[in-house]
């Protein structure tokens, strides 16, 4: 995407430490940032395993200091454990647990004991180190959770707070459906949800793994953009491996984009620690955040984060449906309660904004449901597979002469009737995944069916001495799968009160967090303003992008004899002058403005035409305004009875074609004498028209129509559908998909939704970066043809959200479904494509569902420009993904 190029800005960090298994330690402090421009193509700079540190210093008065001490001084910040640089007394002074984490009646008014983890003495409030329930137990106050919901219309902050602080409470592996357990298991989280702003779920990025998603939350970038494409990965330029246990993950060269804490620091806002090593108890993390909130104004951070390894750890071990999951969820809720009680104790509960958010969901998975590549390939020892809930394949040895990704794909495609994975070249993956444009993403990718794993061979799964499976749950699947969805709750003075919002993608949260802090976001993949409806007041107001190229409105009629395109449309059932009448009809219909126009008559004399067609009389088919072209080019607006097009003089095909299909519309067959009909369009110069001869001479390529002749409103209007300006190149295999979509599915959706508006067109993304290819870029991939072959075709179907209202008379919210269909010479993606189209085409469309924003980036077009809805509402519509999944 256009913003995706921000991966070349790389503000990077050395932040992650992982313990064995899934116990995660992630962290950064405000001063621990290194700058790199790009991904460090030069020699690697690996962190030393044994830095020269004098650990004999002391942490007295320094526990969890925000400033990182540099060598040779020892450290007392939250990450010193990760870097083996803590002072000798760090555990003794900073990780105290004596006395427990709560006040009891017996402890109220106790004599201060400096060995205690937190205090219940009379002076603890003044010193900012009370246990979080001190006021409740010792002073008779109520727990935050027991108070009624209150609408906080303006922040109520103590003097010195220039902005409401933001606390990000992130939980690993929190499946969205866990929220159904409600207040009996999670009363504090449920109160945040019911009193604040929440969505039914939040969609993670693909792959639905921890590292990619935590860093996406921090940067607003897709993994292909920020570079963390998995929990483990190989960079062929670095010739280095990144994984959870190795030290290479500390190297800043892997981390792209600009995370929130860098955005804050660069704009003069202090950021606290973002993630915490697993050795630091949750209670200590909360108490530390609360203590930071009491720092002097010039030291106090404005943004904080808490990170919990649960419920992911238990979800892997027991599965998402195991009864053992209840206690980990109770523990998380207890920690949330400690935070909220602590904020109330500091009189900050009406001041601070809190985001409770997950990184991904969890699915029921066991070893028994594993596909082994050894059952498909004879050479599994020659490949490296990143296994599990997705598969990434590369050769075992670099520059392996016999390794061919296409051969691997062929040997894995549709080999068994019960196959539980689907192989793709990465450029053929659904565009909605945004998982291709990075050298760390292997050429061969396996999308694995939910609840299944993939491995090279059985030994690599059952390798434990017991031979038993050691997990019951996992994640990483397609990010539209309902079990992969996670939680989002926003609570505080800036969030709306008791508000439910539609689901959204986690790439959008970075912009929201910047808005909450009054920051200007760095370039990112989110759509700034699309989540304005979450907030009580909006500091950012998005504006409609400027149109770069305005269209032409053809004013010259060419003679039929001017065309020698090899196109015929013989209709022996009609009078001889039928086509001449149809051509005149093309020129004058849908006209309004009395503009003098000139056209060439049958004898080349100049004639006057006072009925110009500069604008349509009624926006019958462009219900939401004409799409804007956001790059320099040349294109014409062509009006017809049943559709309108923006015809490219560069690509010799429409950039878009729009039409509206009513619920009552009929689907008619094409008469036999018109099955091969293609008409020249006398409004467009022959030099800007396709040649039908090219298709006759190319047996591998056919053509289709963007407006379907099947939906023509009359026999006369049907001829418009056969114009060469409605024609696009299509592989014969793809025509089966396109024709079924137009003939059957469009009518089906129109019937179900009380009419739909359809906009369809070509996509050119030869370099699979998710962006519209320029003409020069296309020439690099397409030689010897004036008509480039699209890599994909898109279609956007819009109706009224309230199906009782017709699509063309909708005065309420809109509903949209969009598709980006790969244009390929075969239908191997669907293993049953030899069957009737009714058995497989719609499922293929659902796999390639997309957001309107995806299509806008792929085409450099801007849709929905003329509507009564607010622009933020339109952005919300554009960023919505129809997943076709069952309710969570």
From Swiss-Prot:
Q: Which positions fall inside the SMB domain?
A: 55-98, 99-143
Kindly list the positions annotated as binding 1-(9Z-octadecenoyl)-sn-glycero-3-phosphate: 210, 231, 312, 475
Q: Which GO terms describe its cellular component?
A: extracellular space; membrane
Q: What is its main location?
A: secreted
Q: What is its EC number?
A: 3.1.4.39, 3.1.4.4
**How cofactor binds (record note)?**
Binds 2 Zn(2+) ions per subunit.
Question: Where along the chain is 1-hexadecanoyl-sn-glycero-3-phosphate bound?
Answer: 210, 231, 312, 475
- What are the boundaries of the region Phosphodiesterase? 145-502
The entry's active site is 210 (nucleophile)
Location relative to the cell: Secreted
Q: Where is this motif: Cell attachment site?
A: 127-129
Instruction: Name the positions where Zn(2+) 2 binds.
Output: 312, 316, 475
Q: Which residues form the signal peptide?
A: 1-27
Give the highest taxon in the source lineage.
Eukaryota
According to its UniProt record, what is one Pfam family this protein matches? Somatomedin_B
Q: Please, one GO biological process term?
A: phospholipid catabolic process
Top enzyme category: hydrolase
**What UniProt keywords apply to this chain's record, in alphabetical order?**
Calcium, Chemotaxis, Cleavage on pair of basic residues, Disulfide bond, Glycoprotein, Hydrolase, Lipid degradation, Lipid metabolism, Metal-binding, Obesity, Repeat, Secreted, Signal, Zinc
Report the glycosylation sites.
54, 411, 525, 832
The positions annotated for binding 1-tetradecanoyl-sn-glycerol 3-phosphate are 210, 231, 312, 475
Question: Could you tell me what reaction this enzyme catalyses?
Answer: a 1-O-alkyl-sn-glycero-3-phosphoethanolamine + H2O = a 1-O-alkyl-sn-glycero-3-phosphate + ethanolamine + H(+); a 1-acyl-sn-glycero-3-phosphoethanolamine + H2O = a 1-acyl-sn-glycero-3-phosphate + ethanolamine + H(+); 1-(9Z-octadecenoyl)-sn-glycero-3-phosphoethanolamine + H2O = 1-(9Z-octadecenoyl)-sn-glycero-3-phosphate + ethanolamine + H(+); a 1-O-alkyl-sn-glycero-3-phosphocholine + H2O = a 1-O-alkyl-sn-glycero-3-phosphate + choline + H(+)
Regarding protein family, the annotation reads: Belongs to the nucleotide pyrophosphatase/phosphodiesterase family.
- Comment on protein domains: The nuclease-like domain is most probably catalytically inactive as residues that are essential for catalysis in the DNA/RNA non-specific endonucleases are not conserved. However, it is required for the stability of the protein and the catalytic activity born by the Phosphodiesterase domain.
- State the protein's name: Autotaxin
